[in-house]
Amino acid sequence: MSQWKYLVLFFIFIFGFILKTLSDAGEFKTLDPHFSGDCLPIPGVVGAEDITFLKNGTALISSDDRRGSYLGKDIHGTIYSYKPGENGEGLIDLFPNIKNDFHPHGISVYEDQNGGTFLAVVNHPSSGLFNSSGGHSIEIFHYDSDSLTHLRSVKDPLLVSPNDIVLINKDQFFVTNDHGSSSKLGQTLEKYLQLKNSNVLFYDGLNFDVAAIGLGFANGINISSDGSILYVAETIGKQLSIFEVDKTTNNLELMRSIDFNSGIDNIEIDHEGNLWIGSHPKVYTFSRHMKDSTVLSPSQVYRFSMDNSSYNIEEVYLNLGEELSGSTVAAVYGRTILIGSVFEAHFLDCKY
């Protein structure tokens, strides 16, 4: 075969690879925006990437100006508390004077039988937090009356690229690594080649162990109220993986994986046991939005329920990005949905 034919075949391969990648990322989807409710934008909170409700209806919000950090600005993130229905007046910065390098990501709350409330935060410091050394960390706090008291920092080499966390008590938790590689090149290859190299870790209060492997960008994580079922959102895998938890050993056994055909992100659970999942229907568009705020990224919210062998997936909210770009989380309390995103300078307080 002549040299030019090899060249033609090479370009055909590259073109086909690009088309497949864009198709897998949802770029050719036709989207029909809808929501049977009303949303109010709540300004003043930048990058409300994760939101979770306490049992009393107060929401805790993980906030960080990630674009500002990318541009080298000397800024830090924070945790807000928010009481829905007060038009933003119920918003309180729990770290107004923090000077440490605090860049929160996923969060989880555990409320014990004695009334104690504990918050775990995935943190991405560049120079450490609360006297911890550099690198990723899990920060544990006690929450009381709109104040946070830092209890400890947890670090380990297995925390390669932590994303989200779920406490099973005040000392133990599961955490996702959204990549298996810590290098930029390795992480880029994982994304575009859709490699399933990410994992879930379990921390027993002293040590980390790998609990699940072979996941396609393990992102949001949550657990059933009785602690028997663990849910993991795979953004690149576009599926929800459901694990049975051995309550004695906390080992995980994969029960099933359910296709969403969307880049699902954080998982919240309402009082009825329904999963609420923020999602990116067009993942490549979201990656462009990360670099350029003028590129709107569609926002999507699913409600997922499962009963024995049957399940139901309902798309509750879909917007092309005008109302909120790049939704990552939908936290629910009663008839209120709080929808957050990675970069926007507001979140949505919705009634449905």
Describe each PLM feature range.
Residues 40-77, 325-329, 342-344:
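Beta-strand-rich domains and repeat architectures in extracellular enzymes and scaffolds
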Residues 58-60, 118-120, 172-174, 229-232, ...:
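Conserved beta-propeller blade signature
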Residues 45-55, 98-111, 156-173, 179-181, ...:
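Beta-rich, blade/repeat-based domains predominating
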Residues 42, 48, 66-113, 118-125, ...:
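Blade-loop segments of beta-propeller domains
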